[in-house]
Amino acid sequence: MSGPPSHEIGMLYSLAPSVDMKSENIEDLPSESIPTTNHCASNYFYAPECPDIGHLRALSIMNRWTETEFVISDDLRDVSMLTEEERYFYRFLFTFLSAADDLVNLNIDNLLGLFSQKDIHHYYFEQECIEAVHSRAYSIIQLMLFDNDSLARAEYVKTSLNSPAIQSKLDWLNKRVIECSSIAEKYILMILIEGIFFSASFAAIAYLRINNLFVVTCQINNLISRDEAIHVEASCCIFKNYLMGPKPSIGRVQELFKEAVQIECAFLRTAAPRNSQLLDVEAICSYVRYSADRLLKELDMPPIYNEPKPTADFPLALMTASNNTNFFERRNTAYSGSVSNDL
């Protein structure tokens, strides 16, 4: 598959600058980015330091899954049931999610240099592992939507990554990364990528399940969205409790959230099929605003929109962490534990 343009990879890498520990001018590095290197005995064995992050790592481990557990060919019959516009829309969503997920995974290595705590390192190792599963799952789903024509998929990806809807997200991130005054502000941008810029896509895919379409794809979407809920909760926890140095003001964080929500809703409205009965665009935009308020509360900041919780018939409400299984699902994808910020 043709990869995203190199400037996009550079943009996401710049979200968490790596630290060159070989630098002779260590005093020139920002103090907030210099990890602790004390040569004490605890450097050479594991000792719990971050119980909250340790809990999220353990939750992620309990709920490991792989793409090989699912038979995506069961969904092939449903491809022909989509209109041409609907098929284009879902191809577009999975192209975006696949590219963004891969780039987030590339960026995790750079995050490790910001922290000395082994609990945080171990958590990020676990996140890298499951993000790789997401990447492989997205690739399988993409091929299904292109009738297993890998050349057609590659050509489409090459073109769609330059679409205005995706470029608006990348351009905004580029601009904001350049303007960032601290690593903490860049960390907020990472929270927005996984917490806001994925949310409309997850919801739009979930609408397929209430129409008994793409059952296996929806099961995978279920698991990926729950994994990302853990990742975002961990990012909020690390930002609040373990990221040293100056942090952006509440006003600045709210400004970034407002802009991200506007871009995500515009992304959906631009790409969504106009005459489809499958999804409710305005309900999804309401969910995006609700997600923003929820994340701000997770960061101990006041909400912006005071958006109500989605109603019970909103499809992502089926993706709770409790042991519930949709009537149409043939494999139970209930999580072993609970995610505190889930619906």
From Swiss-Prot:
As for what it does, the entry says:
Ribonucleoside-diphosphate reductase holoenzyme provides the precursors necessary for viral DNA synthesis. Allows virus growth in non-dividing cells, as well as reactivation from latency in infected hosts. Catalyzes the biosynthesis of deoxyribonucleotides from the corresponding ribonucleotides.
Q: What is its EC number?
A: 1.17.4.1
GO process annotations (BP)? deoxyribonucleotide biosynthetic process; DNA replication
Where does the chain bind Fe cation 1? 101, 131, 134
Protein name stated in the entry:
Ribonucleoside-diphosphate reductase small subunit
- Provide any one GO MF term from the record: ribonucleoside-diphosphate reductase activity, thioredoxin disulfide as acceptor
User: For this UniProt entry, what is the primary localization, expressed as one broad class?
Assistant: host cell
Q: Where does Fe cation 2 bind?
A: 131, 194, 228, 231
The scientific name of the source species is: Gallid herpesvirus 2 (strain Chicken/Md5/ATCC VR-987) (GaHV-2)
Write down the top EC class of this protein.
Answer: oxidoreductase
Catalytic activity from the UniProt record: a 2'-deoxyribonucleoside 5'-diphosphate + [thioredoxin]-disulfide + H2O = a ribonucleoside 5'-diphosphate + [thioredoxin]-dithiol
Q: Provide the family line.
A: Belongs to the ribonucleoside diphosphate reductase small chain family.
What is its quaternary makeup?
Answer: Heterotetramer composed of a homodimer of the large subunit (R1) and a homodimer of the small subunit (R2). Larger multisubunit protein complex are also active, composed of (R1)n(R2)n.
GO cellular component terms, alphabetically, are:
host cell membrane; membrane
Q: Which cofactor does it need?
A: Fe cation
HAMAP family xrefs: HSV_RIR2
Q: Which UniProt keywords apply?
A: DNA replication, Host membrane, Iron, Membrane, Metal-binding, Oxidoreductase, Transmembrane, Transmembrane helix
Q: Which domain of life, per UniProt?
A: Viruses
Q: List the InterPro entries hit by this protein, alphabetically.
A: Ferritin-like_SF, HSV_RIR2, RNR-like, RNR_small, RNR_small_AS, RNR_small_fam
Q: Its membrane topology, per UniProt? A: Single-pass membrane protein
Record Pfam families: Ribonuc_red_sm (PF00268)
The active site consists of 138
Q: Which cellular compartments is it found in? A: Host membrane
Q: Where are the transmembrane segments?
A: 188-208
